Amino acid sequence: MGVKLEVFRMSLYLTFPVVMFWISNQAEWFEDYVVQRKRELWPREKEGQRQELEEFKQKIRKQKEERLLQAAQQSS
């Protein structure tokens, strides 16, 4: 009984990773599960959203510059 159990366990240890690699490398599976899940988690950006972000970054940079200029003028 012990030898048969060890043979079964060893065959299970060897076949499980091989089967998992085979399944995960299937193109249809990858498209259905991985790419679709990625699109759900991180949807594509809208055009206006990127422009709003750039405007916000410029606004923050301008405020930082103004604070630095005020600090430089006060220290002089």
Curated annotation (Swiss-Prot):
Q: Where in the cell is it found?
A: Membrane; Mitochondrion; Mitochondrion inner membrane
Is Mitochondrion found in the keyword set? yes
Gene behind this chain? Pet100
Q: What is the lineage of its organism?
A: Eukaryota, Metazoa, Chordata, Craniata, Vertebrata
Please give the name of this protein: Protein PET100 homolog, mitochondrial
Recorded family membership: Belongs to the PET100 family.
Please state the span of the N-terminal signal peptide per the UniProt entry: none
Quote the subunit structure annotation.
Interacts with COX7A2.
Choose one Gene Ontology CC annotation of this protein and give it.
mitochondrial inner membrane
Q: How does it sit in the membrane?
A: Single-pass membrane protein
